[in-house]
From Swiss-Prot:
GO terms for cellular component: cytosol. Pathway: Pyrimidine metabolism; UMP biosynthesis via de novo pathway; UMP from orotate: step 2/2. This is Orotidine 5'-phosphate decarboxylase. Substrate binds at residues 22, 44, 71-80, 131, 192, 201, 221-222. Catalyzes the decarboxylation of orotidine 5'-monophosphate (OMP) to uridine 5'-monophosphate (UMP). Homodimer. HAMAP family: OMPdecase_type1_B. One of its GO terms (biological process) is 'de novo' UMP biosynthetic process. Its EC number is 4.1.1.23. Gene3D superfamilies: Aldolase class I.
Amino acid sequence: MKNENLQQKNQTVSSPIVVALDYASQDAALSFVDRIDPQDCRLKVGKEMFTLFGPQFVQTLQQRGFDVFLDLKFHDIPNTVAHAVAAAADLGVWMVNVHASGGSRMMAAAKDALVPFGKDAPLLIAVTVLTSMDEEDLRGLGITVSPAEQAERLAVLTHNSGLDGVVCSAHEAQRLKQVCGQAFKLITPGIRPAGSDVGDQRRIMTPIQAQQAGVDYMVIGRPITQSSDPAQTLCDIRASLLNGIAS
């Protein structure tokens, strides 16, 4: 079912780093992408860039050899989300996500929609609690538990719905591995090399801290995309992870 013209997914990427692209210009995005090696990372395309540039942009990244995490956080009725996830799979992305708060029926429908894709199906993960949210934010939504407790509730729901993993804060990673098992993938934004600006992420960790906590894939944006030498920054982060030295 997947578009036969798309470059096959890169099955040899061992890096846990996913670079978050955040550009208003496609030319600027591709200029950055052409400075890094697809063996060193995967790429995340979110709502803004997908809305601006569409599926063709994802295909362009894939043609350059990159695996793509399509970060659109689908949240709708089960049938709509199932069709959206299938469309993402047909595009050939490496990973796609939904909101766990959409419930178990929605997540199960999304998982079922990927069955026809077999081994070519993307990883299907769910968003638990956004890393920009704290207890005050949750209280405003009528949720009286801590972000960690809410993330655990939603992670268990995701696991029971048959999905591959969750997006979560690195602070919840160790506990979620205990609750959901080592095979359950944890994808974590809010990762900043030591000394980086924290931006709008409140619950952050360094790459080495995230690795030690059990994170499988760490999403890093501006510390790499705004670096004067992004390829070297990527190499430095990977070296720190391999050597167990904080970057």
